[in-house]
From Swiss-Prot:
SUPFAM superfamilies: Ribosomal protein L13
Name the UniProt record assigns to this protein: Large ribosomal subunit protein uL13x
GO MF term set: structural constituent of ribosome
InterPro entries named in the record: Ribosomal_uL13, Ribosomal_uL13_CS, Ribosomal_uL13_euk/arc, Ribosomal_uL13_sf
Gene Ontology CC: cytosol; cytosolic large ribosomal subunit
Keywords: Ribonucleoprotein, Ribosomal protein
One GO-annotated biological process of the protein: translation
Matches recorded under Pfam families: Ribosomal_L13 (PF00572)
Amino acid sequence: MVSGSGICAKRVVVDGRHHMLGRLASNTAKELLNGQEVVVVRCEEICLSGGLVRQKMKYMRFLRKRMNTKPSHGPIHFRAPSKIFWRTVRGMIPHKTKRGAAALARLKVFEGIPPPYDKIKRMVIPDALKVLRLQSGHKYCLLGRLSSEVGWNHYDTIKELETKRKERSQVMYERKKQLNKLRTKAEKVAEERLGSQLDVLAPVKY
């Protein structure tokens, strides 16, 4: 990613699983403003500190905030985990300026890991990981679970799709492991067959 690491890939795919919501959002906002394209997947597994009941009460208070004369004017209350995360990032960006709007346009958010991002190497942000930032024994809840409690209807669907994706990934991993094993065996056989010829080739090999 741009800041700190000195690496600037065209697009960075971040796995949101077990990252703290606010810390992940602030790191993402900083990278977006620096010109980085960021894709965040598995938003339903982002963590919030505090138990589910407490977080649900806070969200229900937020749902009561509306414009009395015309509620459709706002504020808009998102239920999907990806949109909740997107709104959190938006609050950390000056999105009403051209620079902020351009930064927000560089962000993509998804529940689960849809193609083609299931074939791309995914990153984590250590500064935002639950295991490093939350004390052991501290209560937390998942954003997907909270969303399903306040009106998001696709929690089970995403769970089912993720199970299928993991099964496909496991099959591909086993196949790759088998191919690597066969390649190692073939190289060993070739070395035994060539024998002394390898000593002649050694000085000119890369």
